[in-house]
A protein has these predicted regions:
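A structural signal for short secondary-structure junctions
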Residues: 158-160
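Short acidic/glycine-enriched loop/turn segments that link adjacent beta-strands
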Residues: 86-88
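Short beta-strand segments and strand-loop junctions that repeat across beta-rich extracellular domains
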Residues: 163-177
Length: 210
């Protein structure tokens, strides 16, 4: 039996970012539910998502991916903004960096997903705060509130260094997010920039047309 899966980078449990962003997500999901928001979800930055396979295939892929990746800087956060997609409604943008972009490209290749943010646009790392089809006025209010509550805290804005990847079952048809579940948490390799450079060079060589 197959499911829809995602690979997430989650902030350290119990840290300021995880606690404060989680509280904000839960509060806004409840407040905006009458306006088309989804249920609450765990704070995360999606490394790659929307791939379909069996549980065993997903687990095997996540373990191999973690073995191929170094620790990933998910930092800093630039601002809070809004978007036009259900799963990119209101979110905090992460400043792109080579390691994060390379990790996304490697993950996309591993799970057979087209790299990027869709429509030919590049990967846009972000931490979602609201999912849903929410009126623009409510999005604007949420952006302002998140900016005031989250972006003024240096411990939040500074982001984190991802030391693991998490495998989540994410049925995108479930607007409540109640069926979403984490099924695996896999530590990343502890290697530095030299190995990252090799990963990047190897990836470019594999993906360049002949």
């Amino acid at each position: 039996m197959t499911s829809i899966w995602s690979i997430w980078l989650e902030p350290p449990p119990g840290g300021v970012l995880e606690q404060r962003s989680g509280e904000f997500i839960r509060a806004q999901s409840a407040r905006l539910k009458p306006h088309g928001a989804s249920g609450a979800f765990a704070p995360h930055v999606t490394l790659v998502g929307g791939f379909e396979c069996t549980l065993e295939e997903a687990r095997r892929g996540a373990v191999q991916l973690a073995a191929d990746l170094a620790r990933i800087p998910v930092a800093p956060f630039m601002d809070v903004t809004k978007g036009g997609r259900f799963h990119q409604c209101v979110y905090m943008r992460v400043e792109p960096n080579d390691q994060l972009a390379t990790a996304h490209a490697i993950a996309a290749e591993a799970f057979g997903v087209k790299a990027g943010n869709g429509g030919g646009s590049p990967y846009m790392p972000h931490l979602s705060l609201v999912y849903g089809d929410v009126p623009e006025s409510e999005k604007d209010a949420c952006v302002a509130e998140a900016t005031a509550q989250l972006c003024g805290d240096a411990e939040i804005v500074s982001g984190w260094e991802a030391t693991n990847v998490s495998l989540w079952r994410t049925d995108v048809g479930d607007a409540t997010c109640e069926s979403w579940e984490r099924v695996e948490l896999v530590p990343l390799r502890k290697c530095g920039l030299v190995k990252w450079a090799r990963f990047y060079e190897d990836f470019i060589q594999r993906t360049q047309p002949p």
